[in-house]
Amino acid sequence: MSNDRPLTHSEAESSALRLGRNPGLQVRHDEVERSLLTPMLQHYAELKDAYPHALLLYRVGDFYETFFQDACTVARELELVLTGKEGGKEVGRVAMAGIPHHALERYCRTLIEKGYAIAICDQVEDPAQAQGLVKREVTQVFTPGTVLDTELLQPRRNNFLAAVVLSGNHWGLAYADVSTGEFCTTQGSDRADLVAELNRLQPAEILLPTEAPDINRVLRPGEGKDQLPPELPPQWCYTLRSPEDFQAAAARQRLCQRFQVKSLEGFGCEHLPLALRAAGGLVAYLDETHRQQPVPLQNLSTYSLQQYLFLDPQTRRNLELTQTVRDGSFQGSLLWAIDRTATAMGGRLLRRWLLQPLLDIEEITARQDAIAELMANSSLRQSLHRHLQEIYDLERLAGRAGSGTANARDLAALRDSFRTLVSLAAVVANTSSPYLQALAQLPPVIEQLADTLSAALVDQPPTSLSEGGILRPGAYPELDQQRQQIEQDQQWILNLEAQERQRTGISTLKVGYTKVFGYYLSVSRAKLNQVPDDYIRKQTLTNEERFITAELKEREARLLAAQSHLFELEYQYFVQLREQVAAQASTIREIAAAVAAVDALLGLAEVALYQGYCRPQLTRDRQLCIRGGRHPVVEQTLPAGFFVPNDTQLGTGADLMVLTGPNASGKSCYLRQVGLIQLLAQMGSYVPATSATLGICDRIFTRVGAVDDLATGQSTFMVEMNETANILNHAGDRSLVLLDEIGRGTATFDGLAIAWSVAEYLATILKSRTIFATHYHELNQLATLLPNVANYQVVVKELPNEIIFLHQVKPGGADRSYGIEAGRLAGLPAVVIQRAREVMCQIEKHSRITVGLRKSSMGDPPTAPEINQGELPF
């Protein structure tokens, strides 16, 4: 049962039963006669009609309550008790679940992470002053991709909202992070590239135009697969949208209106119709979900996938860039190994650099130069790190100010960050890198805002904007006058107790206050005969009587009115202050980008310095030469000096390396190591090696291990073949291909035939720089037949009763895999090991593989193996 489709009676009742409640509760608001509901529930039902695909959280006193089918969903997802509320005399009890108002953010985060949209209905008038039903309105709509509240976001990850437009095999993609303002669009002609880009972005929500009648339905992860194009994985949250929002003319008009321009030429998407339509549809959705206050977006940026090193989903997964394959954890990933950033902005940017490596050598060199300058100056590094730790998330704070949702603490965080930036500008004044100089040239408005906010805000303001205490005394004369009047009235009340004790002779008389009755004079029952005539009885208690006087009520009324006026005035001045900041949101975000870049580069410099990385030389040829290369993650998990470095040479003689060696000897680690070094180099980082000269690579492909894909009914071997086909259909001579164990998921000789053919195709047709790890030692024959193939092995040291893995990659092919020895080390029973050795002897005696020379169907002289298997006697 989910909120994004109507519930059947049986589903609702079974949900109630599972939650241990009476299944007689009303759970469908659209199946109840509206006029029979209580006035509050009638209003709830009307709002639910307006927001049918969102969970409606309805403020009632100190709780946000949900009713009917939403209550069932909220109770299940948040593991709350499903209870009931009286719905009307003829209706009975309706399903209800509630959450305390102070826990709203925590519960909303859980629901959003589960893919739900949420509509927040708040009380917009004081219940004490309400005539009848308290006035309520939907004040916020949260969807997974439109969240602005920092409490609902992960600090070091973007929260992208994406929009996709499909036309045949062509596609358009736009994405935005409403919390940072980033807004980008692109288009392409291969849907596989679209899926790869979505995998890079990991959007929280994807907008998809559809002709289906259920517009605005939210498909939570894993739901509604039949409503998605087959290429789009159901692992994400999709929102179905009307195609009208994605029409070219409407999209162009909407974008021009948003950015106050007459043409989109300056944004680079004027002649990219699918990209333009996707961007326009995304803006339409934001206009709908943020009606009260538009989301401030940066200018639309158009990019091409051809600007960056392409990484398909399998490569990102196999290289464990942001999470491990084993358990999906961050620790053990490449990002974990290199992230030393001090700010959330820097963390997000480093992730983007890692997933979007560069092709432009000049851009790469600029990052390398900055890292080199930082590595050479320890005092600069220390000072930068100290300052960066004091800078808050400027990108998201600017977004909250621009959207009118920033509170006083947000502005205080900006104030403190601006002060730090002024100091930081002096630190980098004498640097040479453009990245560092971007912080030296601080716009004057930043220092002006720092002064303005410092003069206006108290040092540690409260988060609430409705209770005062935000603005500094002396900043606003009108506020000071109000405060003075309030202080005088408060002092009069403080003095009243002593005055009345003296006037009445009642030594135990006290002045008290309650929210219900206000200020009062308390007299014990034993002293009632001393009460003067001007006292007005207000309340009788067991041991005391409470009174008021006309003057006390007058002072109280004046005090409360003055306090209310003070709060209103203070809020008005605060809003003006927030608008001053909002007017500079784009400038603040530009500075934020510069801070993030310096933070990311400083972290990379720290890693390079303390892990012993070298500066790679990037070239435009096909050379891949690594001396003393190391795996950047594995070496950090081992004691210092334990990792065995290895060399790699491709592209200047051999294009394809056939890598053989025992199980568990480190072949897979070596493959990943080479891929990670190439990737780190193209993101502008130093690399874990003694030296490295690397030709720019346009794509990295990996096929390392495979498992059954139960969701699509594909076997391990079929998954392997699909991944291999993708590589052979997209790789070129500037690609890096890393293959591990092609053909092992089928019969031995079928697998060998496929492995031989794939290796031959890569070497002779594609000429990709390739490392081909295999246990098919017959592939070593390729090196004798093809000039651009070389054999390497991971060597071991053989002792009488064991082997020692040396983890060294040396020229030459191995003739054994030591699989039985690996089984022994893994703990297989001795009888099994002995029998395996007997069977191996028989296989070696009776099975032979001969290689016959013949013309290859792929061209010139390579050979294919001719396999003959004798009858085996076991």
From Swiss-Prot:
ATP binds at G661, P662, N663, A664, S665, G666, K667, S668. The keyword DNA damage applies. One of its GO terms (cellular component) is cytosol. It comes from the Bacteria. One of its GO terms (molecular function) is ATP-dependent DNA damage sensor activity. InterPro entries: DNA_mismatch_repair_MutS (IPR005748), DNA_mismatch_repair_MutS-lik_N (IPR007695), DNA_mismatch_repair_MutS/MSH (IPR017261), DNA_mismatch_repair_MutS_C (IPR000432), DNA_mismatch_repair_MutS_clamp (IPR007861), DNA_mismatch_repair_MutS_core (IPR007696), DNA_mismatch_repair_MutS_N (IPR016151), DNA_mismatch_repair_MutS_sf (IPR036187). Residues 1-20, 854-874 are annotated as: Disordered. Disulfide bonds: none annotated. Signal peptide: none annotated. GO terms for biological process: mismatch repair. Residues 1-12 have a biased composition (Basic and acidic residues). Coiled coil: none annotated. Keywords: ATP-binding, DNA damage, DNA repair, DNA-binding, Nucleotide-binding. Gene3D superfamilies: 1.10.1420.10, DNA repair protein MutS, domain I, MutS, connector domain, P-loop containing nucleotide triphosphate hydrolases. This protein is involved in the repair of mismatches in DNA. It is possible that it carries out the mismatch recognition step. This protein has a weak ATPase activity. Belongs to the DNA mismatch repair MutS family. This is DNA mismatch repair protein MutS. It comes from Thermosynechococcus vestitus (strain NIES-2133 / IAM M-273 / BP-1).
